[in-house]
């Protein structure tokens, strides 16, 4: 297996949330229903989900993305569409579908890469995109996403 260093910005798209909802302005429910969606914030608990809210669905962020809390560096795979609070970026893989296994691998690598950052630093997108990750390589330049999935999936 060969490994290569990549800039996070060469592997991931860092997108702003489709809408920012402040906790003091929304009705947060404890339980999921058919009419509400996860409300992802900067917490380190419960996959970043503070609760569930019912808001304008055009502001939902896509499923199968990674939520990244900019001032806590908390990262979680989000398997369904979700709303966010303030300072949460939405990450997707460039040129490849993001699965839970691939996200788990990437988040582990990013946690290692961000381990020297101070908690409470509000990471701007330019800084985030320049952090280096070591990833398995498929060809000279392409990360091996299938291998990442196999490593996490156990086969």
Model region roles, listed by residue range:
Residues 1-46, 139-155:
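Non-catalytic DNA-recognition/assembly elements of restriction-modification systems
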Residues 7, 36-39, 65-67, 90, ...:
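Generic structural signal for residues positioned in beta-strands
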Residues 29, 79, 122:
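Beta-strand elements of modular eukaryotic interaction domains
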Residues 32, 59-60, 124-126:
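Intrinsically disordered, low-complexity regulatory regions enriched in Ser/Pro/Gly/Thr
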Residues 43, 94, 136:
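Structured beta-strand/turn binding interfaces of compact recognition modules in eukaryotic regulators
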Residues 47-48, 75, 98, 114-117, ...:
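Short loop/beta submotifs within extracellular cysteine-rich repeat domains
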Residues 50-107:
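A short beta-sheet element
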Residues 71, 87, 106-138:
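Glycine-anchored helix-breaking recognition loops at helix->coil/strand junctions
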């Amino acid at each position: 297996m060969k490994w290569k260093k990549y800039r996070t910005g060469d592997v991931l798209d860092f997108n702003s949330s489709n809408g920012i909802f402040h906790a003091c302005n929304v009705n947060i429910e404890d339980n999921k229903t058919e009419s509400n969606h996860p409300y992802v914030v900067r917490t380190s608990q419960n996959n970043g989900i503070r609760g569930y809210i019912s808001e304008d669905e055009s502001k939902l962020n896509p499923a199968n993305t990674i939520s990244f809390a900019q001032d806590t560096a908390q990262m979680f795979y989000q398997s369904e569409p979700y709303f966010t609070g303030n300072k949460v970026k939405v990450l997707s893989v460039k040129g490849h579908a993001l699965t839970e296994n691939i996200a788990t691998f990437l988040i582990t690598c990013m946690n290692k890469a961000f381990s020297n950052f101070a908690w409470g630093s509000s990471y701007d997108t330019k800084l985030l995109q320049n952090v280096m990750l070591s990833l398995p390589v498929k060809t000279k330049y392409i990360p091996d996403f299938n291998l990442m999935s196999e490593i996490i999936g156990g086969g």
